[in-house]
Amino acid sequence: MQAALRAFFMLLFSLLSLLGIAANGFIVLVLGREWLRYGRLLPLDMILLSLGAFRFYLQLVGMGHNFYHSAHVVERSGVLTQQFFHLHWHFLNSVTFWFCSWLSVLFCVKIANITHPTFLWLKWRFPGWVPWLLLGSVLISFIIALLLFWVNYSAYQQFLIRTFSGNMTYEWNAMTEIYYFPFAQLVIWSIPCSVFLVSIXLLINSLRRHTWRMQHNSHSLQDPSTQAHTRALKFLISFLILYVLSFLSLIIDGTKFISMQNDFYWPWQIAVYLSVSVHPFILIFNNLKLQSVFWQLLLLARGFWVA
């Protein structure tokens, strides 16, 4: 890839990451301020605050890793740094996957019109479980990330004696990263992904049936209730697309199919971090509280700029 084109994609990645950092930081500041003021948060706000905080940290780690290793791509000393990045990367991505899954479950139990006794029981109990589910997700993700790091520690430690063992250690590390990590990630992340897909599919189906009934009961497409359901469906479908895109891109990224020396590395990084950067804006513009504060800040900034 030509240097100018590579610089363009690096700049695009930086802008996308900075926008995501700003959006996630905004969510954390607004909801964190409310938490400090009132001493409590609604279950939805708990999940949004936690998701925003971990995504904020994830994007900082991602930017730091990409630019550090692009500057030290020929230095072997970066391998140890790479493994510590992987520890954080696995942990943060696992946590955000779980938080997105709990967010979809909360939407499902609050909105879906399902009369099954088990669902009604879950609808009543789930909001009270949210703090413990968030804490449990963090602990489980941390333990799994440590186990993945520990299992492969001996292989990575051999980097220190690579000059005495030829290319065998390098080949072992490459085989481990290409075959073991993607399989482990697929198994681990498939659990929250399954929870997400089941809950989001139930909710989309419930909203779709309800919207269809309203349209066939003489409700116009311009009816406020119909429009609200249509907006909710669009929000959920975009949430589903971004979640699946993030899941697939991270699994593929774990294969190291596109290395840093590859011409398509920076366009691929844009795809990997696209969901983390775009989804916060979707959350902001579909949450009345966050949307209200956002427009207030925008008006203040506009007034300050004009003055």
Curated annotation (Swiss-Prot):
Q: Quote the record's miscellaneous comment.
A: Most taste cells may be activated by a limited number of bitter compounds; individual taste cells can discriminate among bitter stimuli.
Task: Kindly report every residue range on the membrane side named Cytoplasmic.
Answer: 29-40, 110-129, 205-234, 286-307
Specify whether Cell membrane is a keyword of the entry: no
CDD domains cross-referenced by the UniProt entry? 7tm_TAS2R41-like
- Residues crossing the lipid bilayer are 8-28, 41-61, 89-109, 130-150, 184-204, 235-255, 265-285
Q: State the similarity comment.
A: Belongs to the G-protein coupled receptor T2R family.
For whether the record's keyword set contains Glycoprotein, the answer is yes
Domain of life, per UniProt, equals Eukaryota
Q: Which residues form the signal peptide?
A: none
Q: How does the record classify its membrane topology?
A: Multi-pass membrane protein
Q: What is this protein called?
A: Taste receptor type 2 member 41
Under the GO molecular function aspect, what terms does this record hold? bitter taste receptor activity; G protein-coupled receptor activity
Q: Which gene encodes it?
A: TAS2R41
InterPro entries per UniProt: TAS2R
The chain's Extracellular topological domains, given as residue ranges, are: 1-7, 62-88, 151-183, 256-264
Q: Which residues form a coiled coil?
A: none
Compartmental location: Membrane
